[in-house]
Amino acid sequence: MRHGSIPGTRGHVRPLALLGDPVLHAPCEEVTDHGPELARLVEDMFATMYAANGVGLAANQIGVPLRVFVYDCPDDEDVRHVGHVVNPRLIEADGVVLRGPEGCLSLPGLEAGTERYDRAVVEGFTTDGEPVRVLGTGWFARCLQHECDHLDGGVYVDRVSGWRHRRVMRQAARAPWNRQRAPEPR
């Protein structure tokens, strides 16, 4: 991505993988080639995220099992954070654990109270292979943890238990986008 360009303006919107798609439930592979295809992938990810009104998107959510995510997310002070991380590692998640509403572009229209730390630090690389360290607090910390979970083969409903889990899984089973892909409620 060129410095100063608006992310996603040159990208193409790709279809989203939905809950139950195997690509969402398997760990993603490390990126080994920082060439032009990676930059195009990131542009497509931004375009897809913006088209779906999201604040974050992992590569496996568009069917690409690589360790990459993009974000355009505010923190609790309404400071906007925009960027991408290649081969991210969640190196810190600490502070207060808060249960808050969490949704996902791969479960459109659904949300559940999900516990997350209110501070997170992610390290990785840019599309050019330059090291990057991202610190998030509040809502942005939630976003960073959510996207890292995706790359490890998880979705937020995996972190929800009890009646909240049963409720969101029932809602997923009844959702118009579900074509018998969602796992049965436990």
UniProtKB/Swiss-Prot annotation:
Its cofactor is Fe(2+). It is an enzyme of class 3 (hydrolase). It comes from the Bacteria. GO terms for molecular function: metal ion binding; peptide deformylase activity. The active site is at residue 147. It catalyses: N-terminal N-formyl-L-methionyl-[peptide] + H2O = N-terminal L-methionyl-[peptide] + formate. The keyword Isomerase does not apply. Binds 1 Fe(2+) ion. Keywords: Hydrolase, Iron, Metal-binding, Protein biosynthesis. Its EC number is 3.5.1.88. Fe cation binds at residues 104, 146, 150. Coiled coil: none annotated. One of its GO terms (biological process) is co-translational protein modification. Removes the formyl group from the N-terminal Met of newly synthesized proteins. Requires at least a dipeptide for an efficient rate of reaction. N-terminal L-methionine is a prerequisite for activity but the enzyme has broad specificity at other positions. PANTHER family: PEPTIDE DEFORMYLASE (PTHR10458), PEPTIDE DEFORMYLASE, MITOCHONDRIAL (PTHR10458:SF2). Belongs to the polypeptide deformylase family. This is Peptide deformylase 2.
